[in-house]
């Protein structure tokens, strides 16, 4: 598995968060 940054950002944006790839994981962080 690998992190797709664009998909990560989109899914996090719907939560009002910023998407970042950490290794192969998507992390949602506050702006």
Curated annotation (Swiss-Prot):
UniProt key word Ribonucleoprotein: no
Protein name in UniProt: Potassium channel toxin alpha-KTx 5.1
UniProt xrefs under InterPro entries: Scorpion_toxin-like_sf, Scorpion_toxinS_K_inh
Matching Pfam families: Toxin_2
Signal sequence extent: none
Comment block on domains: Has the structural arrangement of an alpha-helix connected to a beta-sheet by disulfide bonds (CSalpha/beta).
Extra remark beyond the main annotation: A mutant [R7diaminobutanoic acid] has been developed that discriminates KCa2.2/KCNN2 (Kd=3.8 nM) from KCa2.3/KCNN3 (Kd=2500 nM).
Species for this entry: Leiurus hebraeus (Hebrew deathstalker scorpion)
Post-translational modification: Two disulfide bonds are the minimal requirement needed to produce a nativelike and bio-active conformation in this toxin. The third disulfide provides an additional contribution to structure stabilization and can modulate biological potency depending on its position and the structural regions involved in biological activity.
GO molecular function: ion channel inhibitor activity; potassium channel regulator activity; toxin activity
């Amino acid at each position: 598995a690998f992190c797709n940054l664009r998909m990560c950002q989109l899914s996090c944006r719907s939560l009002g968060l910023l998407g970042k790839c950490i290794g192969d994981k998507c992390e949602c962080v506050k702006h």
